[in-house]
Curated annotation (Swiss-Prot):
<dbReference type="GO" id="GO:0016413">
    <property type="term" value="F:O-acetyltransferase activity"/>
</dbReference>
<keyword id="KW-1133">Transmembrane helix</keyword>
<keyword id="KW-0325">Glycoprotein</keyword>
<keyword id="KW-0333">Golgi apparatus</keyword>
<feature type="transmembrane region" description="Helical; Signal-anchor for type II membrane protein">
    <location>
        <begin position="15"/>
        <end position="35"/>
    </location>
</feature>
<keyword id="KW-0472">Membrane</keyword>
<dbReference type="Pfam" id="PF14416">
    <property type="entry name" value="PMR5N"/>
</dbReference>
<dbReference type="Pfam" id="PF13839">
    <property type="entry name" value="PC-Esterase"/>
</dbReference>
<feature type="disulfide bond">
    <location>
        <begin position="318"/>
        <end position="391"/>
    </location>
</feature>
<comment type="similarity">
    <text>Belongs to the PC-esterase family. TBL subfamily.</text>
</comment>
<feature type="glycosylation site" description="N-linked (GlcNAc...) asparagine">
    <location>
        <position position="96"/>
    </location>
</feature>
<dbReference type="InterPro" id="IPR029962">
    <property type="entry name" value="TBL"/>
</dbReference>
<dbReference type="InterPro" id="IPR025846">
    <property type="entry name" value="TBL_N"/>
</dbReference>
<feature type="glycosylation site" description="N-linked (GlcNAc...) asparagine">
    <location>
        <position position="194"/>
    </location>
</feature>
<feature type="topological domain" description="Lumenal">
    <location>
        <begin position="36"/>
        <end position="416"/>
    </location>
</feature>
<feature type="disulfide bond">
    <location>
        <begin position="100"/>
        <end position="165"/>
    </location>
</feature>
<keyword id="KW-0735">Signal-anchor</keyword>
């Protein structure tokens, strides 16, 4: 190689470097604004979202879902939360008998001296998903500027008071209305979010008279709803319905103004018809009444008691301290739930309706009732031979808090 050729090599190298450097900005520009991988990435994400099967509940503390995912969530079935087990939860409840001021006296097991606390440290674990802890801020956001009404018997009140305790951890409710014996009609306001929460005592949902000193049986008109809540129906955005146990009492039934029959009517001159069909018709009448106007309806299924065949005043009734591990639904509990599920299925096409199916999970919690601690310090004067027990309602805090953890998921899906 001659001297001139050797001198030309650096020049050629400079030209090549210059050309390469000139093309780098152009390549970068094309990658940024015409990236051939961008469409592949977007398509992959969209396909993934389209094929997602919802297997877990979500909460505001989890990663925010995209709008595309939200749109699809509406069409996907929820994980079956009705099948599962109670597992230990070391975190415990969000409130206690001292921090919540709206607990009915008979359900404040802590203040009434219940000595064990293990019943507080369980959570419901569905077989195929997880239920997030109750998010009070999320609930209030979902119900902003809305009116939520609980309608039914003392189990509806039990669930309501659980909800108030959960919400009061972030915002104090103001009692703005109360009426009736034992404050059976009450209304609260959460000014922070303009949320109204009400409870209406209506143990049959339909019109009727409750037994009293002058009446030894209930009277039900099963073809029209109870006006005590029916007259306020247009004020409600969301309704939670919960009844059942009052239908077991003696009653005379009317339909279209005529006597239909009765249940346990030893002194009445009418036909014994039982209560199952009447319970069904009462649920049906109610769901027809609340249909329309975009109103959201949640039907809470039958909540089992745990007297286990023992008298209500027997010593040791519902004195369990742990959940059952394998008890199955049967008898009354199974039949009442079956009726509610069937009526829910029939009405779902006409009503914006969800069923809060708590029967199976609740039958596993004999430890969650007040028992003798429905009254304060029941053994302060020793152990009596007979003592009143509440094996129906739930201690607060207690298993009923789980019902509201599931309910918030229903509200979230409605708001998507």
């Amino acid at each position: 190689m001659g001297l001139n050729e050797q001198q030309n090599v650096p020049s050629q190298r400079k030209i090549i470097v210059f050309i390469v450097l000139a093309f780098i900005p152009i390549a970068l520009f094309r990658l940024c604004f015409n990236n051939p991988f961008s469409s592949i990435k977007d398509t992959s994400l969209q396909d993934s979202a389209a094929n997602v099967v919802i297997t877990s509940f979500s909460s505001s503390s989890q990663e925010e879902e995209s709008q595309e995912s939200f749109d699809h969530i509406q069409d996907e079935p929820l994980c079956d939360y009705t099948q599962g087990n109670w597992v230990r939860d070391e975190i415990g409840p969000l409130y206690n008998g001292s921090t919540c001021g709206t607990i009915k006296d008979g359900q404040n097991c802590f203040r009434h001296g219940r000595p064990d606390s293990g019943y507080l440290y369980w959570k419901w674990k569905p077989n195929e998903c997880d239920i997030p802890r109750f998010d009070s801020n999320r609930f209030l956001d979902l119900m902003r500027d809305k009116h939520l009404a609980f309608i039914g018997d003392s189990m509806a009140r039990n669930q309501l008071e659980s909800l108030l305790c959960l919400l009061s951890t972030v915002s104090s409710p103001d009692l703005v209305y109360r009426n009736g014996e034992d404050n059976k009609f009450r209304r609260w306001r959460f000014e922070s979010h303009n949320v109204t929460v009400s409870v209406y005592w209506s143990p049959f949902l339909v019109a009727g008279l409750e037994k009293s000193g002058n009446l030894d049986h209930n009277v039900l008109h099963i073809d029209r709803v109870d006006e005590r809540w029916g007259n306020d129906l247009e004020r409600f955005d969301t309704v939670v319905v919960s009844v059942g146990h009052w239908f077991l009492h003696p009653a005379v039934y009317y339909e279209s103004g005529s006597v239909l029959g009765c249940h346990s009517c030893e002194t009445s001159n009418c036909t014994e018809v039982g209560f199952y069909d009447v319970f069904r018709k009462a649920i049906r009448t109610t769901l027809r009444a609340v249909a329309g106007s975009g109103r959201e309806v949640i039907l809470t299924t039958f909540s089992p008691s745990h007297f286990e065949g023992r008298p209500w005043d027997s010593l040791g009734a519902c004195n369990m301290t742990k959940p059952y591990e394998g008890k199955v639904l049967e008898g009354l509990d199974l039949d009442m739930r079956k009726i509610e599920i069937e009526e829910y299925t029939a009405a779902a096409a006409e009503v914006r309706l969800e069923v809060l199916d708590v029967t199976a999970m609740s039958v596993l919690r004999p430890d969650g009732h007040p028992g003798p601690y429905m009254y304060a310090d029941p053994f302060k004067n020793g152990v009596p031979e007979r003592i009143p027990n509440d094996c129906l309602h739930w201690c607060l805090p207690g298993p009923v808090d789980t019902w509201n953890e599931i309910m918030i998921e229903m509200l979230r899906r409605w708001k998507v």
